[in-house]
Structures are given as C-alpha cells and as structure tokens.
Amino acid sequence: MLKAPRFWYQPRSLLGGILSPFSFLYQIIVRIRRGLYAVGLKKISKFPVSIVIVGNITVGGSGKTPFVIWLANELKNRGFRPGVVSRGYGGKANRFPQTVTENSDPLQVGDEAVLLMKKIDCPMVVCRDRGAAVKHLLRNFQCDVVIGDDGLQHYSLGRDLEIALLDDRHLGNGRCLPAGPLREPKSRLNTVDFVVPKQLRPNEIYQLKNPAKKIDFNELKELTVHAVAGIGNPGYFFKQLETLGANVIAHPFRDHYFYRSEDFNFDDDHLIILTEKDAIKCKQFDDERLFCFSVDAVVPDQFQNDFFRLISNIILRKQAQREGI
C-alpha cells in the first residue's frame, strides 16, 4: 500500500476535483457489487458460529490490529472460544488457507498476522478467501466466535456483527477512491452495528535485540530519535512519540514494507524506534539501536457493554440452533 496522498485529507483540492468523476464511477461499482450480494445473485458463505467483522471504510491506518488483539483476548477472558481470520496481506505463501503460529514467517503470512498471533491466545488462519479461512478454522479448532480482520468489504463472508473503526483523520475529504480515502461511501457507516474511534495507549518501549532492556517514557523527553513506520497512518505514530516529549526524525515507509539493514544506515547514533508491526520484520538485525514501541487499544466502556451483551445472545442462539434446541 502506497502512502496516502495529502489531498485526500484536504477539504478542497485541484487534484481531488479532477478525480471526482472517477470517484463517482467507483461508488456506482461498489453499490452494484454490494447489491448483488444483497439480492442473492452473488453467494454469501454462512456458518454455524458467530462471525464478527472488524474493518473500516477508509484506506489504512485505523488501528485494526490493536483492536482485534484486544477483542480476541477479551472474548477469551470472558469464557468464549474465539478464532481470527485474515487475508494475510503482504504474505507470499504458495499454500492457503494457512494456520498462523508464533514461528510463522511474515514474508509468508504477512506482518499483521504474525503480530496478531504473538499477542492473542486463540487460533488464527490466513487466506485471501475469507470463507475458506473460516472453514479451515472450524475444521481444526473448536471456536464459537470468529473475528474477521479487515473484512468489512468482503461481502462473500456472512456476518452477525460489523464493527467499523475510525482513526484521527476521520473520513478525510469525504470522497471515495481515487479522489479520497474512502473504500465505500460514508453512508456505509449507517449500516454497521458499531463505529469505534481509534485510541491507542503507549505500553512500553523495548530493545529488539534484548527485550528485557526497556526505555522509560520519561527518558524520551528532549531525546532525539529516528521514528520508522511502514504502516497505514505513520503520522499517528510520530505524533505519539512527540507527545511523549521526543524530538522525532520521521522516516515513513510504505505500508507492509520489508526492511533491509541499509534502511537504518543513518549518519548518527540516535535510537531507532519502530512500530510493533515493523519490529516483527526486523528481529534478525543485530543492531542495538533498534527499539519497539508497543501500544494497546483503548476501547470505550459503552461499546464494551453493548457489544458483549449482543454477542453473548448471538452465540447462545447459534449454539441452540446447532444443538437443535
């Protein structure tokens, strides 16, 4: 995924205006595609367990990964048996569906999938075909709820609940691709079950070479650091470090970028701080300057109350249907 154009987040721009006819055409195609599923002309895969879709209507950077980590672990803590399916974006494996393990190679299954697997206590499967991923998951694991990571636009996968995440940039200029950042018209938010704002809380900063070595957040004050981010919204990461007091030298890379050691050949000895998703792909580098900035999702209490009330009822209903009650 390439860096988002600046004009996507400007109310008025010449380029946005020039591209607006293409956005109108894109919207028509999106509506037709969704309509074909709605009237049954395109097949929707349905399953006997609850399916919860987590996604967004904008391109990249809405905090899906930390949120899915929180959701999977919270479901497990409440006594449910969750599983996660994802596309495995950036992975180049020849065989799909594929179960992700802590030892999976990010080059094969994708960086987000490996990060998720390291931080959740439940099974995960990646496949471009989300329906095939769910089938594989249910065939090999006893799950009663499946989380579809970044699956809002994958209408071939049936769903019981939809959660749309919004980052600090909201909907940008409000236009669909290519004139704006929207994958679907903003009216799509009226059809999801929940809209949750992105909010991330700093957790810790640790050295990749020796994770026991950590940096206290107070040590960042007035410290000059190289901030490296190959994510959908690198600006959010840079701003977090600046808020903690660091003097940030920003190095944005394209989303899902795979690093080489020469990418860190800076002309000084300042610390290099990476996002968790980037750090997953840099553990092989023998460089004491590399540190990882980990974060946790902050989830509104009202959402938690409403969501778990709904999902509990859905899981119980589907369980009764499976048992013929």
From Swiss-Prot:
One GO-annotated biological process of the protein: lipid A biosynthetic process
Enzyme Commission identifier(s): 2.7.1.130
Pathway named in the protein's UniProt entry: Glycolipid biosynthesis; lipid IV(A) biosynthesis; lipid IV(A) from (3R)-3-hydroxytetradecanoyl-[acyl-carrier-protein] and UDP-N-acetyl-alpha-D-glucosamine: step 6/6
Enzymatic class: transferase
Catalytic function, reaction form: a lipid A disaccharide + ATP = a lipid IVA + ADP + H(+)
MF-aspect GO terms: ATP binding; tetraacyldisaccharide 4'-kinase activity
Pfam assignment, any one: LpxK
Superkingdom, taxonomy of origin: Bacteria
Binding site for ATP: T58, V59, G60, G61, S62, G63, K64, T65
Keywords, in A-Z order: ATP-binding, Kinase, Lipid A biosynthesis, Lipid biosynthesis, Lipid metabolism, Nucleotide-binding, Transferase
Keyword Kinase included in the entry's annotation: yes
Entry's Gene Ontology cellular component terms: plasma membrane
Entry's family note: Belongs to the LpxK family.
HAMAP family xref list: LpxK
Protein function: Transfers the gamma-phosphate of ATP to the 4'-position of a tetraacyldisaccharide 1-phosphate intermediate (termed DS-1-P) to form tetraacyldisaccharide 1,4'-bis-phosphate (lipid IVA).
The protein, known as: Tetraacyldisaccharide 4'-kinase
